Amino acid sequence: MKKIILVAGGTGGHFFPAVALGEELIKRGYEVHFITDLRCKQYIKQDMKVIFHILDLKRSGNIFLFLPRLSIAVLKAIKLLYNMKPSVTVGFGGYPVIAPMFAAIFLRVPIIIHEQNSYLGKVNKFFASFAKKIAISYEKIKNLPEFAKSKIVVTGGVVRENIRELKVIEMSSRGLTTGSKKSLIKALDSVVKPRHDKLFTIFIFGGSQGAKLFSELIPASIQILMQKQPSLELNIIQQAALDDQVKIKDIYSKLNITYEVAEFFDNMALQYKEADLVISRAGASTIEELTYIGLPAIFIPLPSAADNHQYYNAQLLADEKTGWCLEQNNISAGKLADKILDLISNPKILEDASQNLLKRRKEGHKLLSNLIEEVI
């Protein structure tokens, strides 16, 4: 049985797509090993079929500290890969992949890199010259070296299986006057209907780096929104840190709206089912999931994201009229409230965005697996 190594770490945004790819490859008869770092250890579940290996590389701004750490990590990776004898190594970018990718190059194992974002990251750009193929999620990608263009294959991103099973969400088009429900998207294979049939549902999540801002901004925006339209029927589903939940719930209770506030949602598919609109950061995996199910979003990119890639992701979708980009440095509760009200008042805008998203959808798990098999 041929062995394939996947390398991803740092955040769930890198981890879960790689696991989804691994599950597809296992179905095709391959033995899949996954090298990740300590930060992603929390995401590993017993029912995951890939074989995990923890290889941690701590970052340091001090080059004299980082180089010895990198050297040790590379030696460990060489030993690991030498014993496995993989047919190919696939890296998803970010510094956790550095040591295994160096090891693969040293052992002459073919490498493929996958760039989830619309901006080629520094690590992927460095390894581009060594890669057999470069899989990308977006047809338009920034920071791509000229020599690498011949290696490019557009596969789209990889979406988790439980999200893929949703197929297409039947969105709700609710005018402020009628509150009526009509289907925006006809089912391709199946339809999942929101549980809150009469309420316009907004799902807000920001990840570990974004929840604090959203805990302050979103309730303030909803307050303004309800002041402008007191008769509006809303359902708010929001991710928030434990320390912020009491204050948020108090605000929503006083507004007399339906809400659910939690620190973490184990199964995002359940929340996606209900949502008519998402407010989130603009990480690649989030965008791929929303694209796959045709769920429009207002994106507030994380300014500190590497190479400002979240801004480029969100702006690309805004340019294609598949989403809306509001920059954190320029946003206010009033501006966000106005944008939400505009979308609720003009359901055709949501309908068009949803349809445009579905036009972008790709079966990334299959296309990337096909590419890997070509290299093998």
From Swiss-Prot:
One of its GO terms (biological process) is carbohydrate metabolic process. UDP-N-acetyl-alpha-D-glucosamine binds at T11, G12, G13, N117, R160, S208, Q310. The keyword Cell wall biogenesis/degradation applies. Its EC number is 2.4.1.227. Pathway: Cell wall biogenesis; peptidoglycan biosynthesis. Coiled coil: none annotated. It is an enzyme of class 2 (transferase). It is found in: Cell inner membrane. CDD domains: GT28_MurG. It catalyses: di-trans,octa-cis-undecaprenyl diphospho-N-acetyl-alpha-D-muramoyl-L-alanyl-D-glutamyl-meso-2,6-diaminopimeloyl-D-alanyl-D-alanine + UDP-N-acetyl-alpha-D-glucosamine = di-trans,octa-cis-undecaprenyl diphospho-[N-acetyl-alpha-D-glucosaminyl-(1->4)]-N-acetyl-alpha-D-muramoyl-L-alanyl-D-glutamyl-meso-2,6-diaminopimeloyl-D-alanyl-D-alanine + UDP + H(+). The keyword Zinc does not apply. SUPFAM superfamilies: UDP-Glycosyltransferase/glycogen phosphorylase. Keywords: Cell cycle, Cell division, Cell inner membrane, Cell membrane, Cell shape, Cell wall biogenesis/degradation, Glycosyltransferase, Membrane, Peptidoglycan synthesis, Transferase. It is a peripheral membrane protein. Cell wall formation. Catalyzes the transfer of a GlcNAc subunit on undecaprenyl-pyrophosphoryl-MurNAc-pentapeptide (lipid intermediate I) to form undecaprenyl-pyrophosphoryl-MurNAc-(pentapeptide)GlcNAc (lipid intermediate II). Belongs to the glycosyltransferase 28 family. MurG subfamily. This is UDP-N-acetylglucosamine--N-acetylmuramyl-(pentapeptide) pyrophosphoryl-undecaprenol N-acetylglucosamine transferase.
